[in-house]
Amino acid sequence: MPVSLLRALLVFSLLCLGLSATRAAHAAMEIEVVGGAANKIAIAMVPFQTAAGQPSPPLTQIVADDLARSGQFSMTDVTGAAQPVEPSQVDYAAWRTKGAEAMVIGQVVALGGGRFEVRFRLLDVVKGTQLAGYSYKITAAQWRATGHRIADVVYEKLTGIPGAFSSRIAYVQKQGKRYELRVADADGQNPRTIVRSLEPLISPMFSPDGTRLAYVSFEDKKPVVYVQSLQQGGRRKVAAFKGSNSAPAWSPDGRQLAVVLTRDGASQIYLINVDGSGLTRLMRSGDIDTEPVFSPDGQTLYFTSDRGGSPQIYRVAKSGGDAKRVSFEGSYNVSPTISPDGRYLAYISRDGGRFRVVLQELASGQTRVLTETTRDEAPSFAPNGQAVLYATVQGGRGVLGTVTLDGKTRARLSESGVDAREPAWGP
């Protein structure tokens, strides 16, 4: 049986999560940009001004890190430069000399009672005009969220594509013998634990509206699919049938899950309502079918199967019928995920013993290797489709990373001393 397909039977996931025990750590995740695309937008991030004696919030660094991680921007050196607060104070010619094409200026005003007003302006340095200006009233607990919000505005105004910096990721962290399902900001910061267990937790996936997580838990001494509310905290067993229940995938309308069951012996894909009713088998075969994912329009499912003799990616209509092979390069392709616009698949491909993230354009079938690591798994697209989140292994432990679609900008979300696996990118 191919190793990848054992994931459907959950042995693969147990092996992935069962690395050597590590000590708990609370260090912030670190971002390392290791490459970059051509034609980046040169942007100057002028430090946000604060009143004398007032601590400087981390807004400037949060926005700069977000933009750098996107691969679309280069940071103009602001050392020794004037630090304007209003557009009327900006010497555009001087900033053009420094190579800046755009700049962000702003200030933080203390309102009292633990509240602040954050004002910022996005300026076109080349034309000498203002592109955007906003003011937010926040508490001290909202610095990071506000920084991500500003980065989203900057990204969209300068690229025409919505930003995804205010989105969230989910992942499983192993600390010693404990497993934690966590949700964090898209940069890995502000993690909070959703579920704790002494048994493995795997395969988290956000609902389309971001209010729920589907995942698999072994707490009943068998794999069971749960759906958990991120707002109220309650959860429901959705699939707890005889045998293995695994690989939940949301339909775009949030009403159904595709799940993989072995209730009839073989690993097969079923559709089930989120309340656990309406179980329907998608196909009937003696092959191992697993890792389903819906197309954005909800009419097609992509999945992994060994029906051709080796694990490959296939697609089938939601109404059933014959499956058609999608991946053709290489003898081992697993774990498909589809971009929000339906143009691309990302999946894990094995090449000479290396497991790496590959991007495939569905219309042409052309592929591109996105990563240089060798033990990648669980790719997941950003909500704006401009990057892929994945897990890999470095130094004997699981770490999370992101990579842009051109493969030139890769970032590590590496929290010291823990194993982080099974990532999913949500709204």
From Swiss-Prot:
The keyword rRNA-binding does not apply. Keywords: Cell cycle, Cell division, Periplasm, Signal. InterPro entries: 6-blade_b-propeller_TolB-like (IPR011042), PD40 (IPR011659), Tol-Pal_TolB (IPR014167), TolB_N (IPR007195). One of its GO terms (biological process) is protein import. Coiled coil: none annotated. Residues 1-27 form the signal peptide. SUPFAM superfamilies: TolB, N-terminal domain, Tricorn protease N-terminal domain. The keyword Signal applies. Its main location: periplasm. It is found in: Periplasm. It comes from the Bacteria. GO terms for cellular component: periplasmic space. NCBIfam families: propeller_TolB. HAMAP family: TolB. The Tol-Pal system is composed of five core proteins: the inner membrane proteins TolA, TolQ and TolR, the periplasmic protein TolB and the outer membrane protein Pal. They form a network linking the inner and outer membranes and the peptidoglycan layer. Part of the Tol-Pal system, which plays a role in outer membrane invagination during cell division and is important for maintaining outer membrane integrity. PANTHER family: PROTEIN TOLB (PTHR36842:SF1), PROTEIN TOLB HOMOLOG (PTHR36842). Belongs to the TolB family. This is Tol-Pal system protein TolB. It comes from Thiobacillus denitrificans (strain ATCC 25259 / T1). The gene is tolB.
